[in-house]
Amino acid sequence: MTTPTTRSRGMPRRTTPVPSGRGQTPLLVGIGVLGLVIVAAIVAIALGGNTSGGLAEPARAGVGVSGTALPALTDPAADTAVGQGLPSLTGTDLSGEPISIGPGDGPVAIVLLAHWCSHCQAEVPVIVDYLASTGMPEGVRLVALSTSIDAARPNYPPSSWLEREGWTVPTLVDDASSRGLAALGMSSFPGFVFVDGDGRVVQRYTGEMPAEAFDQVVRAIAP
C-alpha cells in the first residue's frame, strides 16, 4: 500500500525529488577539471536524467485518459466499480513505444506496480512463474501499469527492476501525477483490475494475489 499498514492474519499484503611559472600547471589542470564537470552536467541535463535505458521519463511522458474514471476502491467486497466500463488509457511503455489499455481490448487483467513497493517486488515473480508454468487463458490479455515512479525511492528505475525479473508483460508507464492510477480508482500496491469481454469491471483487488486466485479470476473472464 502506498501508506504502510499493519498486516493482520488473513489480510492481503500490500504497500498504500592566472599566475605564471610553476604555479600555472596546477591552475590549468584545475580549470580543465572544472570544464569537464560543467560539460558532464550539461550532457546530463540534455538527457533529462534518464538512466533507465529506455524508460519513458514520468515527468515528460503524458498519460491520456478518456471515459469515466472508476470510483475509488474503498471496500473490495462491495466495489461500486463492478459493472462500470473501463476508461481508456494511452501512453508509452517501458521502452517508449505507444501502448493503450481500454474497454475494447476484450477480457483483460491489469496489474498495478510501484517499483519501491516490497509487496510488488514479491508479486512480480509470482506472475512471471505463472506465465511460464500455466500461461494466460486464450483470449485474455495481461497488461501492467508502472505507477508512482519516484527516482528518490528504492529500486529505481522500474524498467531495470522488471528486466531483472524477466518481466515480459506490456507495461504502461504512468506520468508524474499518477493519472493512470487515479483513473482506475486505485491507491494501494500491488493492485489488480479484471475486465470482461464487454469492457466492464468484474473485480478489483489490492495486495499480493496468490497464483491460484489469479488463475481463477482470469479463467472466469476468458471468452
Region spans (language model):
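Thiol/disulfide oxidoreductase modules built on the thioredoxin-like
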Residues: L28, D105-G106, E163-W167, D174-P223
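A short beta-strand-turn-helix
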Residues: A78-V108
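Short active-site neighborhood of thiol/selenol oxidoreductases, capturing the structured segment around
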Residues: I99-I127
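Hydrophobic beta-strand anchors of alpha/beta hydrolase catalytic cores
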Residues: A109-I110, L142, F192
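Structural microenvironment flanking redox-active thiols in thiol-disulfide oxidoreductases
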Residues: Q121-E165, V173-A182
